[in-house]
């Protein structure tokens, strides 16, 4: 076969998608293909979905005359990314503790003994934005995902900041804050709850965003306050890693302009902050780039 390709996979709690990416140029070689992910299913159902992804990728590789030379997965956490083992008690519970690379080898679908990489989803997002997106012209960068939850990743000195399992250095979502944890105050549900406490109305974050854009002062303050809280709680990370750029993804990033100034003011240090440029494609672009980065830095 001709070109070498990376099988880039974005595996979430409820869906999974893949694409083939050039190992040389990191250009996308195929369109994205989507599958439902049976998060609460049996081991057989979950592994069957992974098998469908691998079989689909092999079929695509034959169509475009390329060889799959590595695989790279963006995954939720907690996850042992070094060994490819899910540690999640709720999502994919039936494969908790299972070594996925060994399962893939036993399927005998992909070429044998190709390298397989796993990357926490916030890191996949960060690498995508660092190589191809909003942070491309910066060095030390902090990636933040705000959606149903809260996650951060650090890119410093041309590499990811990783813990012993290959995960993000900081689990700021569970930092104690006020009457709970930080995620209670910086997330989609935090926006809903803050607005409800003042107005008595139960709206989702998108509705509150629209209200803010239409002049609702309470809605605008809710977003500004979230930006301030986030900025104050990441300032120590920014200082420790000499961060010069912050890039924010996740669903709440779609309202980024409503809290950007408050975030930057709270962080200080002249740090620049951007909303995601790549949006839903950041993770797959990121894991493909990470695969090449790892191969070059063995």
Model-derived segments and spans:
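Glycine-rich phosphate-binding loop and adjoining helix at the ATP-binding site
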Residues: 39-40, 47-51, 66-71, 77-140, ...
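Glycine-rich phosphate-binding/hydrolytic loop that grips phosphoryl groups
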Residues: 6, 117-130, 258-298
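Stable alpha-helical structural segments in soluble proteins, enriched in small hydrophobic residues
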Residues: 53, 57-61, 126, 134, ...
């Amino acid at each position: 076969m001709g070109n070498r390709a990376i099988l880039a996979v974005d595996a979430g709690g409820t869906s999974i998608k893949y694409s083939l990416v050039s190992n040389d140029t990191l250009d996308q070689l195929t369109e994205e293909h989507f599958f439902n992910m049976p998060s609460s299913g049996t081991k057989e159902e979950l592994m069957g979905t992974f098998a469908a992804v691998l079989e689909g990728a092999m079929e695509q590789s034959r169509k475009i005359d390329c060889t799959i030379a590595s695989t790279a997965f963006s995954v939720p956490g907690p996850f042992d990314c070094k060994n490819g083992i899910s540690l999640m008690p709720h999502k994919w519970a039936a494969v908790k503790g299972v070594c996925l690379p060994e399962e893939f080898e036993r399927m005998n679908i992909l070429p044998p003994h190709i390298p397989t990489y796993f990357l926490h989803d916030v890191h996949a997002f960060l690498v995508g934005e660092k190589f191809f997106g909003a942070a491309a012209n910066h060095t030390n960068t902090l990636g933040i995902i705000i959606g149903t939850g809260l996650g951060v990743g650090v890119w410093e000195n041309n590499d990811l900041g990783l813990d012993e399992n290959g995960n993000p250095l900081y689990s700021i979502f569970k930092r104690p804050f006020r009457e709970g944890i930080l995620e209670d105050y910086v997330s989609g549900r935090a926006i809903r709850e803050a607005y409800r406490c003042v107005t008595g109305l139960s709206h989702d974050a998108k509705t509150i965003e629209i209200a803010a854009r239409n002049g609702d002062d309470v809605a605008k303050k809710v977003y500004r306050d979230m930006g301030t809280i986030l900025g104050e709680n990441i300032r120590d990370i920014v200082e420790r890693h000499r961060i010069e750029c912050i890039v924010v993804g996740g669903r709440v990033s779609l309202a980024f302009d409503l809290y950007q100034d408050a975030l930057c003011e709270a962080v200080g240090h002249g740090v620049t902050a951007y909303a995601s440029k790549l949006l839903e494609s950041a993770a797959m672009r990121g894991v493909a780039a990470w695969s090449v980065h790892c191969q070059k830095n063995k």
